């Protein structure tokens, strides 16, 4: 056999089975804190092994990975941002998450750049380009994994991982476009944020009005389609596309507080709440499906025979150590009270893979390759598992009273 020639019925059967397996993996993840993405990647690796063993080729399967990942990133960040509240009392949490994402990102990029420069003798600019994708927290993995945590810790994880994605993409795009980095890019960055927020606010308001008027039963894919268009246009002109997605979700979920008063009075907030619930459900279902096949395909790109090199695991372990030492030090200094589990919730995943695949060939490193990325990805997930297992959710006053009552009744 020189190519995969499978009947349509078998393809449909396989897609259905894989979707059900992913659903079961998600259920398992909620019970055991074991990330479902590891199992999805493993299935992809096994399928690649089967194809290579039987001499099968796989056409465009690898080529669609970046597109699938971009759509998944849009949906996951949108889903997470629509769950957030921007009430006044949330501002300290938002700023804490923003500074955490920014400071940890800059410190990690600096440390990894110096590590690659001195240890692997890579050029400084190439070291920085390869360090940035490894320094970003993947919201696509962190957000679904925070479901079992307290509301405050979950909100911090959603904000921090989303900010990390946004800052990382902006930094990566500007690093690619500006060699060397110039001071004026920071002014450009500030102007870019203002423009992105203004455009997103306008689009959010227009979509709210349009959704109210649409009577057709199929209407909730419209805002997703608009976001995909905005994301693609943003990528073409090198502006923060992910910030558009994140701020769009915030504007939709917090129209009463984020819209200026002269816009707010034209919004039907009750109808918007109904539309928002439907949009959240559609986004969550779609994100689940896209995420499933993205990580399956990522596993499919891995060749097992390349994983036998011990140095790959050594480099991966060193990178993970740098990432989490910096994270622990910052959170310990900046946070009062417990820093568990959030100190362990810094997974690598979808966004890291997407940025890594977009590094131009002349800036790619033969040392920091996709196999090192996979090892960092897996190590970070196991640390996240440890964080989830070691953290115990505080009991509510009602639960304590009920337990005391049960004990008293036995005396």
What are these regions (language model features)?
Residues 1-411:
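Transmembrane helical cores of multi-pass secondary ion antiporters/exchangers
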């Amino acid at each position: 056999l020189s190519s995969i020639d499978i009947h349509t019925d078998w393809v449909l059967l396989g897609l259905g089975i894989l979707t059900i397996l992913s659903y079961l993996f998600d259920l398992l993840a909620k019970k055991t804190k074991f990330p479902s993405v590891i199992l999805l990647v493993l299935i992809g690796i096994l399928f690649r092994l089967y194809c290579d063993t039987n001499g099968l080729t796989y056409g465009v399967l690898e080529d669609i990975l970046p597109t699938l990942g971009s759509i998944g990133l849009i949906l996951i960040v949108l889903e997470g941002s629509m769950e957030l509240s921007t009430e006044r009392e949330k501002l300290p949490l938002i700023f804490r998450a923003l500074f955490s994402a920014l400071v940890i990102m800059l410190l990690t990029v600096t440390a990894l750049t110096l590590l690659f420069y001195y240890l692997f003798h890579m050029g400084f600019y190439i070291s920085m380009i390869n360090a940035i994708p490894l320094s970003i927290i993947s919201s696509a993995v962190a957000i679904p994994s925070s479901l079992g945590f307290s509301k405050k810790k979950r909100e911090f994880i959603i904000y921090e991982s989303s900010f990390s994605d946004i800052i990382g993409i902006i930094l990566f795009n500007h690093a690619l476009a500006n060699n060397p980095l110039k001071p004026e890019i920071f002014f450009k960055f500030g102007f870019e944020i203002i423009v992105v927020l203004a455009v997103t606010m306008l689009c959010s308001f227009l979509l709210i009005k349009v959704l109210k008027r649409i009577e057709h039963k199929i209407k909730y894919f419209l805002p997703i389609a608009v976001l995909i268009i905005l994301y693609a246009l943003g990528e073409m002109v090198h502006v923060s596309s992910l910030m558009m997605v994140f701020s769009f979700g915030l504007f939709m979920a917090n129209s009463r507080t984020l819209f200026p008063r002269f816009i707010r009075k034209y919004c039907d907030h009750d109808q918007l709440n109904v539309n928002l619930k439907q949009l959240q459900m559609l986004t969550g279902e779609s994100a689940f499906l896209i995420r499933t096949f993205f990580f399956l395909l990522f596993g499919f790109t891995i060749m097992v025979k390349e994983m036998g090199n011990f140095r790959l695991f050594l480099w991966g372990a060193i990178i993970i150590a740098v990432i989490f030492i910096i994270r622990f030090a910052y959170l310990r200094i900046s946070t009062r009270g417990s820093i568990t589990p959030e100190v362990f919730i810094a997974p690598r995943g979808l966004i890291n893979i997407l940025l890594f695949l977009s590094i131009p060939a002349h800036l790619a490193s033969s040392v920091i390759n996709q196999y090192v990325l996979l090892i960092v990805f897996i190590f970070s997930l196991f640390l996240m598992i440890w964080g989830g297992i070691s953290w115990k959710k505080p009991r509510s006053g009602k639960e304590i009273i009920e337990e005391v009552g049960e004990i008293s009744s036995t005396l």
